[in-house]
From Swiss-Prot:
It catalyses: AMP + diphosphate = 5-phospho-alpha-D-ribose 1-diphosphate + adenine. It is found in: Cytoplasm. It holds the Pfam family Pribosyltran. One of its GO terms (biological process) is adenine salvage. It comes from the Bacteria. One of its GO terms (cellular component) is cytosol. Gene3D superfamilies: 3.40.50.2020. PROSITE patterns: PUR_PYR_PR_TRANSFER (PS00103). It is an enzyme of class 2 (transferase). Transmembrane segments: none annotated. This is Adenine phosphoribosyltransferase. The lineage of its organism: Bacteria, Pseudomonadati, Pseudomonadota, Gammaproteobacteria, Enterobacterales. One of its GO terms (molecular function) is protein homodimerization activity. It comes from Escherichia coli (strain K12).
Length: 183
């Protein structure tokens, strides 16, 4: 099933836009409204599974927290394992971490050291691509463990915030179902 214009429009219309959230001047794209619509949620998963079903993916990695909501069902659809990337202190076994910059400060992500094997072909899934900092850190974790990042897939791309370009500089192609301006 290749995504049709009608299907993509349905997904776009299922995502609510909230003015001045979380602060004045921001137009927030709320993917939780898509999750509330079982048809839209299933369609988003089905379209991603269809796109990657013959790509040789061996693992799907999702970033905390909404990346879990899309990455885990995509992994099931592809018949491969799902690997969560989390904030510090949330994973029980041995981890490695990667620090990345935020607008005002830094944050950190962790992955289990045994979650990715050398040669794994990995699809990174998250709900939204904005500046790309979180996904760039996720890619670095995967590569440190010997994994190959095949692609990064998103439900929403805030295309004017530079995330695609940032990932391209890391050699990562990205795919999104619904493009929106970032402001």
């Amino acid at each position: 099933m290749t995504a049709t214009a009608q299907q993509l429009e349905y997904l776009k219309n299922s995502i609510k836009s909230i003015q001045d959230y979380p602060k004045p001047g921001i137009l927030f794209r709320d993917v939780t409204s898509l999750l509330e619509d079982p048809k839209a949620y299933a369609l988003s998963i089905d379209l991603l599974v269809e796109r990657y079903k013959n790509a040789g993916i061996t693992k799907v990695v999702g970033t905390e927290a909404r990346g879990f909501l899309f990455g885990a069902p995509v992994a099931l659809g592809l018949g491969v394992g799902f690997v969560p990337v989390r904030k510090p202190g949330k994973l029980p076994r041995e981890t490695i971490s990667e620090t990345y910059d935020l607008e005002y400060g830094t944050d950190q992500l962790e992955i289990h050291v045994d979650a990715i094997k050398p040669g794994d072909k990995v699809l990174v899934v998250d709900d939204l691509l904005a500046t790309g900092g979180t996904i760039e850190a996720t890619v670095k974790l995967i590569r440190r463990l010997g994994g190959e990042v095949a692609d990064a897939a998103f439900i929403i791309n805030l295309f004017d915030l530079g995330g695609e370009q940032r990932l391209e500089k890391q050699g990562i192609t990205s795919y999104s179902l619904v493009p929106f301006p970032g402001h």
